[in-house]
Regions:
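Flexible mid-to-C-terminal extensions adjoining Fe-S/redox cofactors in radical SAM and related proteins
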Residues: 56-187
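A structure-centric signal for secondary-structure junctions around beta-strands
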Residues: 39-40, 48, 89-92
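Radical SAM enzyme [4Fe-4S]-AdoMet core and its adjacent flexible, acidic
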Residues: 1-38, 47-48, 52, 56-67
């Protein structure tokens, strides 16, 4: 937690003193309003064709050789990601594995997603047990830092209707409730 806080402050200092925008993968979720994985803005397809929610989270219900991309995005693990976003209102705690391991356990167990790491498959319990201590230690530090800062509201939220801060954004959905994507557009 101390190193991460130091990195958070150093990156912001660089941005205010240098003519460059540096991106901090762990601490910049506020710029994309949370975790980008699970098909929200990103997904991972491994060499075997398994469609994982994230390069760091090797659990899947779909394989690109057997399913269309749209089918994979509608698979149980991806829908759990969709329904669970944001995983934390504190954007310094966006990840369902690292900062909210209880949520990843729940999603994998609820959806029946299977491990896809061909080199070192591990249960979700084993993976998340490696993150529990860090999440407990980082949580209070992240909450303190988050409370110190002002935050802009996101101009766009692709969360479930119940989790939107801006209900008026629902107007961008199609009248039938779909997102307008068709299977044939993604094949």
């Amino acid at each position: 937690p101390d190193q991460r806080e130091e990195m958070y402050r150093a990156i912001r200092k660089f941005r205010s003193t240098k003519a460059i925008f540096t991106l901090d993968f762990q601490n910049d979720a506020e710029f994309v309003h949370g975790c980008i994985a699970g098909g929200r803005r990103y997904l991972h397809i491994n060499a075997n064709g398994d469609v994982d929610p994230c390069v760091f989270i090797h659990y899947s219900n779909a394989n690109i050789y057997e399913n269309t991309l749209l089918e994979a995005l509608k698979s149980p693990i991806f829908m759990a990601y969709h329904d669970g976003q944001p995983f934390n209102e504190n954007m310094l705690r966006p990840c369902p594995m690292l900062e909210n391991p209880k949520l990843l356990r729940e999603m994998v167990n609820k959806t029946g997603a299977k491990g896809t790491n061909a080199e070192a498959e591990e249960t979700v319990e084993h993976l998340c047990s490696k993150c529990d201590h860090y999440a407990e230690e980082w949580g209070p530090v992240a909450d303190r830092i988050w409370a110190e800062q002002k935050h802009k509201k996101a101009p766009y939220e692709n969360y479930t209707e119940e989790k939107r801060e801006h209900p008026e954004l629902a107007a961008f959905e199609h009248a039938d409730g779909s997102d307008g994507l068709r299977d044939e557009d993604l094949q």
